[in-house]
UniProtKB/Swiss-Prot annotation:
Gene: nadE
Record-stated family: Belongs to the NAD synthetase family.
Protein name per its UniProtKB record: NH(3)-dependent NAD(+) synthetase
Pfam families: NAD_synthase
Pathway(s) of this molecule: Cofactor biosynthesis; NAD(+) biosynthesis; NAD(+) from deamido-NAD(+) (ammonia route): step 1/1
Residues involved in deamido-NAD(+) binding: 109, 142, 149, 231-232
Amino acid sequence: MPDYMQEIERISEFLRKVLQGKNAVIGISGGIDSSVTLALLTRSIPKERIIPVFMPDRNTQQADYDDVQKLTQKLGLTYREVRIDPMVDSFVSTLAATDRAAIGNIKSRTRMIILYYFANTNGGMVVGTTNRTELLLGYFTKYGDGGCDVEPIEHLYKRDVYELAKILDIPESIMKKKPTAGLWAGQTDEDEIGMSYAQMDEILSDVFDKGTYNDKPEYKKIMEMHSLSDHKRNLPYSLKK
């Protein structure tokens, strides 16, 4: 069993080293990953150097507003709120966009633009919130939530993030919430992928940590997602000199 207290200290030291006195800009949603990452930041650098940004849209649930407020108050932080609807609507209107997934990616990339605005104007670095499960599945938007300067929990499976959340005393309402990327109304990660995070973590750990694999349909699905998203985990294709 991993030593999660030691892992918290390791991540905190990593963040201090990488940020090197710069401000930390982080997008928060009221979800488990951004909540844990925000709490880790408070253990790493002075609170006045942390800039949390909440970027809701018309599909954002009231529970998310409540959880963002609850968490930031608990951590002694002040957050910025920027609604993304006007910007996203402008893109959708200009492009006559109708594809739900493409519009979801526009939302994610709009949030990235906002975070980099605050980083540019506050001498900061953008802190990402992608976990290892999402990384291996490619379950993130290229140049969207995948666009950042440092990824402090990218080596942790979703199950590990929950273990850290317990130690960091993340509010129970956040712990119990169904994970969602919030890209369209009613979307949840597990429904979209078609299996629980516990199943995903077990399969990914079997394949990438233990080197074991079988021909069960769920293994094939996970490996197909990994293969199709390979481009997200690599630099753009280019010719060698």
